[in-house]
Amino acid sequence: MKKIVTTKQMQSLESDAITSGKSERELQLEAGLAAAQEAWMSVGAMPERGILLLIGPGKNGKDGLIAANQLTKWGATPFVYLLRELNIDDDDWKEYQESEMPYAIATEDTELQRLEFVLNEAALIVDALLGIGMDPEIRPLDENLSEITKRVNQTKENIVKPHILSLDIPTGINADNGYTDPNAVKADSTITFGYAKMGLYCFPGRENVGRIIPVDIGLPSNTRHILPYETLELSELKAFMPERPITAHKGTFGVVTIVGGSLQYPGAIRLAGEAAARSGAGLVQIAAPDHIQALITNGLPDVIHEPLPTTGNSLDTSAAITVLRALDKKKTRALLIGPGLGHTAVTTKFVHSIITSLSERNFLNGVILDADALNILPEIQNWSTNLQTPLIITPHPGEMSRLL
């Protein structure tokens, strides 16, 4: 699992590194070198391919400028595009000028014509305009910067698209919560220094980030254990999966029961059943209204079907008892309620009857409430205390707002 940090945590880590003997300059050089290495690999180590670096006035821009100088030493021909003129006493800027590599300044670029030209020539665009200190919620990108980022994003419409690499975080994204300016850079990859920032994993910002590449810049390793947030990657989940014994059979891997379905939404419960079977459950049982059984059984020969009694187009009052008996008979380990169930007075009573009867069924390892079951929950008084079995809920923002 990878540790992720907030802006304040990152600033604190950098401060700790400096206190322990690492200079701010050393941290910048490490970041700039890492950025240059990623840029070099992105263009396939072909110096003739254009590398455009967009340089802002802050620390993020400094990292980009150091990367430009390093690329020059390796034989590349970078083009630096400055958001505004830099201090003539800046050593990195002096070094770049002395290399006689090309550059332009946005404030001197009439109608951004020079930018348009180099954007179309570039195989790689490095976004080093703004870093993690930028908060677009409080201070949106200004008109001039927005014009630059819009044109960067428009290169995605080119026949031959350049690769867009952002340093630490794409310009226009809040590093803590993923809030995104309408004109934020849409990166193909983001190299993030020290630890990945929380906003890289939060939507809507996540859509603009691309591949996340954390790199070490020499922060103290003894502080890692105090960082509370971390990601869980799909590849890492395999370590949590129990090994399947060679003598296993369907009874080894437990029973999943899925409750839901209606005339309007017969497909939802079928998809859930198919997913449960593919995920490795030993046995899958679907409890759905009897009048849609034919729609579900076709194509699912490996699933057990428990028809729920109906009156007309609605579930019968005895449907909940049928579900509970099915749970008992198969000693269900995992119960999913909700896919395609529908939201009516009848289904509300149905879900309530099931939920309030689960605590005495010790064989249940967990209950998942999804879709229409989540819409029904707010109508059930003290639902969270009535359900003692371990619970997983899967609300989208609208459903979550009703639950709260």
Residue positions per predicted region:
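Small-residue (G/A/S/T)-rich helix-start motifs and N-terminal tracts that mark the onset
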Residues: 1-83, 189, 200-371, 375-404
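Nucleotide and nucleotide-moiety/phosphate-recognizing core
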Residues: 37-131, 135-167, 350, 356-366, ...
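Short beta->alpha connector loops
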Residues: 85, 108-110, 171-173, 196-198, ...
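Short low-complexity, flexible loop/linker segments enriched in glycine and/or proline
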Residues: 94-96, 180, 299-303
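Structural alpha-helical scaffold elements that stabilize or flank donor/cofactor-binding regions
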Residues: 118, 183, 326-329
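Internal gly/pro-rich beta-alpha loop/helix module
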Residues: 123-124, 129-228
